Amino acid sequence: MSQLTHINAAGEAHMVDVSAKAETVREARAEAFVTMHSETLAMIIDGKHHKGDVFATARIAGIQAAKRTWELIPLCHPLLLSKVEVQLQAESEHNRVRIESLCRLTGKTGVEMEALTAASVAALTIYDMCKAVQKDMVIGPVRLLAKSGGNSGDFKVDTHD
């Protein structure tokens, strides 16, 4: 099993030194879900929410969150992201919204946390915009779908979960 990289020999949290690492293209994808009543989902799909376009607002929030991950998650490096994409899809058969984020850069450290933050904040934004009509929405699961680039190699979740 790999060692925790954010813990030093004395057991203290620290920011990993990436200065000696080579710059490579790195990409990560994550997903999150928001489950709600069918009436709440229909309101979003039909564009009848009094606060405006829920998907557009959540998309922008997710993109902004990816760009500010280093301010939210301790020990994350500030990154020069070259691409952030947030896609939202209503899944009426499951009464939920699926959010998928993609982050990419050429750099010395990965973008997994940025992708996870983008998907999570987009989900939180949907909750915030819809809580006036439904407070018992459920956020989750949130997970990393895939990552590529860097020394640790590529990862892809088993989609048969």
From Swiss-Prot:
GO molecular function terms noted in the UniProt entry: cyclic pyranopterin monophosphate synthase activity
Q: What keywords are assigned to this protein?
A: Lyase, Molybdenum cofactor biosynthesis
Q: What is this protein's function?
A: Catalyzes the conversion of (8S)-3',8-cyclo-7,8-dihydroguanosine 5'-triphosphate to cyclic pyranopterin monophosphate (cPMP).
Query: Subunit info?
Result: Homohexamer; trimer of dimers.
Annotated catalytic residues: D128
- Quote the protein name from its UniProt record: Cyclic pyranopterin monophosphate synthase
Binding locations of substrate: L75, C76, H77, M113, E114
What are its E.C. numbers?
4.6.1.17
Q: Which family does it belong to?
A: Belongs to the MoaC family.
One Pfam family matching this protein: MoaC
Q: What is the lineage of its organism?
A: Bacteria, Pseudomonadati, Pseudomonadota, Gammaproteobacteria, Enterobacterales
Which PANTHER family does the entry mention? MOLYBDOPTERIN COFACTOR SYNTHESIS PROTEIN A (PTHR22960)
Question: What NCBIfam families does the entry give?
Answer: moaC, PRK09364.1
Q: Which gene encodes it?
A: moaC
Q: In which pathway does it act?
A: Cofactor biosynthesis; molybdopterin biosynthesis
Query: Catalytic activity annotated for this protein?
Result: (8S)-3',8-cyclo-7,8-dihydroguanosine 5'-triphosphate = cyclic pyranopterin phosphate + diphosphate
Read off the Gene3D superfamilies from this record. Answer: Molybdopterin cofactor biosynthesis C (MoaC) domain
According to its UniProt entry, one GO biological process term is: Mo-molybdopterin cofactor biosynthetic process
Top-level division of the source organism's lineage: Bacteria
**CDD domains, per the entry:** MoaC_PE
Q: Which organism is it from?
A: Salmonella arizonae (strain ATCC BAA-731 / CDC346-86 / RSK2980)
